[in-house]
C-alpha cells in the first residue's frame, strides 16, 4: 500500500464504505457526556441524512479500516483483483479521526468495516482494538457499529460486542446459489453459523442482565445484516422470504438492502447495469409490511407480478388492488389489523384513529388530520361522511415514482 497521509486515506476509505447500507443507530442504549464525564453521545441531532425508525437523525463516520482484501468476490469494488487505489488506516488513526470528527460536531458515532487483510482473525482484532480504545482509553460514549467477520474466532466477535452498540454480519446475497456463483470463497453455512453464535451471545447477555445488574452490556442495539440486490437472479419474492427467515432465526434488528452498482473491470457474470433504485425502496417497504403491519410472507409475495414488486406503486397498494374484496374498510368499526392494510395509513395514523374513534364517529376531515393526504385513501375507506364508488381504475391514480441517483 502506498504511503498516504490521513486526508488521502480518508478520501479513499470513506468512498469505499459508501456501498455498505448498514449504518443506522436505532435501538441502542442512551448515553451522553452532559455530566462532564466521558466523551460523545448517542442522543444528539447531527448532520447525517440517515434516519432511525424512531425519527432521530443520526450521523456516523462511516469508513473502512482498509479496502485491501484477500477475497475476490465478483460484485465487490474492493475485491483482490480490482484495479483500485488501496489504503489502510492504523487503529490509532481511526480513533483520532473519530474523536476529531465528534469534537467538531460532525458525527455522533462510528461505523467501521474492513476488507480482509492477512486473515479474518487479524482483521477482526484490529476492529476490536478500535472500539476498545475508544471506550476504555477515551471514554467515548457515542454510537459504535462494527461489521464483523464470519470466519473470525467467535471469541473476537464476543469481545467486539462488549464495546460496540451494534454488530452486523453480511449475508451478502439473497440466495446460497448466488453466493456460490459470485463469492465462491465465502460460505453460507459459516455466515449463518456466525449469526447464530451472535444471537446466542446477545440472548445470553439479556438473560444475565435480568439477574445481575453488574453484567456488562453486549451489543445492546442487536445485530443486523445486508444483502446486495440485483447482482444475481433472485426475485423480490425470494428476497422477502429470505429476509423473513433471517428475522425469525437470528432476531435481527434490521435487514438492509443495497442495490448492486456496476464496478470497473467487472466480471462477465455480473449484470451490465444496476437495477432501478426504486426496487431497493420497494423492498424496504415490503420489509416494513412484514415487521410492523402484520403481513405474512405469502401476502407480500401476492403483491408481486411474477416475483417482482411493482415499481410504480408501493407493495401495500399492490396487495390492496389484488384484494378488492377486502375493501373499503370502515375507519369507525374496523379492527386495527384491518386498518393497517389500508394504503396510505401508517402505524401512527392507525393508532391515532383508534384512539379518536372512542370519542366520536370519524369523517374524512378526521382522516385528513392524521395523514399526509386523503386522495389515496378515499377508494379504500368508509367514513361517517364518505362511501367510495366501486371503481376499477385505481392504479392510474397512484403517483409514479421518480428514479433517483444511486449516489
How does the language model describe each region?
Residues 70-72, 88, 101-111:
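Short, flexible active-site-proximal loops enriched in glycine and acidic residues
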Amino acid at each position: 500500500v502506498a504511503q498516504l497521509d490521513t486526508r488521502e486515506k480518508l478520501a479513499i476509505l470513506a468512498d469505499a464504505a459508501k456501498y455498505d447500507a448498514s449504518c443506522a443507530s436505532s435501538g441502542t442504549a442512551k448515553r451522553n457526556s452532559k455530566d462532564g464525564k466521558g466523551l460523545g453521545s448517542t442522543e444528539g441531532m447531527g448532520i447525517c441524512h440517515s434516519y432511525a425508525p424512531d425519527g432521530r437523525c443520526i450521523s456516523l463516520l462511516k469508513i473502512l479500516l482498509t479496502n485491501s482484501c484477500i477475497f475476490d468476490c465478483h460484485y465487490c469494488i474492493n475485491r483482490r483483483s480490482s484495479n483500485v487505489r488501496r489504503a489502510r488506516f492504523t487503529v490509532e488513526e481511526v480513533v483520532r479521526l473519530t474523536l476529531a470528527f465528534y469534537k467538531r460536531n460532525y458525527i455522533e458515532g462510528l461505523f467501521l468495516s474492513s476488507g480482509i487483510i492477512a486473515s479474518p482473525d487479524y482483521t477482526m482484532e484490529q476492529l476490536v482494538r478500535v472500539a476498545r480504545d475508544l471506550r476504555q482509553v477515551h471514554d467515548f460514549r457515542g454510537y459504535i457499529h462494527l461489521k464483523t467477520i464470519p470466519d473470525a474466532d467467535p471469541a473476537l466477535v464476543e469481545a467486539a460486542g462488549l464495546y460496540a452498540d451494534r454488530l452486523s454480519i453480511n449475508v451478502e446475497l439473497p440466495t446460497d446459489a448466488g453466493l456460490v456463483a459470485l463469492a465462491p470463497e465465502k460460505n453460507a453455512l459459516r455466515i449463518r453459523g456466525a449469526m447464530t453464535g451472535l444471537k446466542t451471545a446477545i440472548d445470553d447477555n439479556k438473560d444475565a442482565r435480568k439477574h445481575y445488574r453488574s453484567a456488562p452490556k453486549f451489543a445492546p442495539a442487536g445485530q443486523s445484516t445486508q444483502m446486495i440486490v440485483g447482482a444475481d437472479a433472485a426475485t423480490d419474492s425470494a428476497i422477502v422470504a429470505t429476509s423473513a427467515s433471517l428475522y425469525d432465526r437470528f432476531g435481527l434488528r434490521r435487514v438492509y438492502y443495497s442495490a448492486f452498482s456496476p464496478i470497473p473491470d467487472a466480471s462477465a457474470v455480473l449484470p451490465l447495469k444496476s437495477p432501478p433504485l426504486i426496487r431497493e425502496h420497494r423492498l424496504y417497504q415490503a420489509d416494513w409490511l412484514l415487521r410492523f403491519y402484520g403481513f405474512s410472507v405469502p401476502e407480500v409475495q401476492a403483491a408481486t407480478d411474477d416475483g417482482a414488486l411493482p415499481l410504480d406503486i408501493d407493495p401495500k397498494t399492490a396487495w390492496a388492488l389484488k384484494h378488492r374484496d377486502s375493501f373499503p374498510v370502515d375507519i369507525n368499526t374496523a379492527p386495527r389489523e384491518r386498518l393497517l392494510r389500508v394504503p396510505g395509513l401508517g402505524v401512527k395514523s392507525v393508532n391515532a384513529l383508534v384512539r379518536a374513534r372512542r370519542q366520536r364517529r370519524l369523517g374524512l376531515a378526521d382522516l385528513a388530520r392524521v395523514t399526509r393526504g386523503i386522495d389515496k385513501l378515499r377508494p379504500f375507506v368508509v367514513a361517517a361522511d364518505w362511501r367510495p364508488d366501486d371503481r376499477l381504475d385505481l392504479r392510474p391514480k397512484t403517483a409514479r415514482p421518480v428514479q433517483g441517483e444511486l449516489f
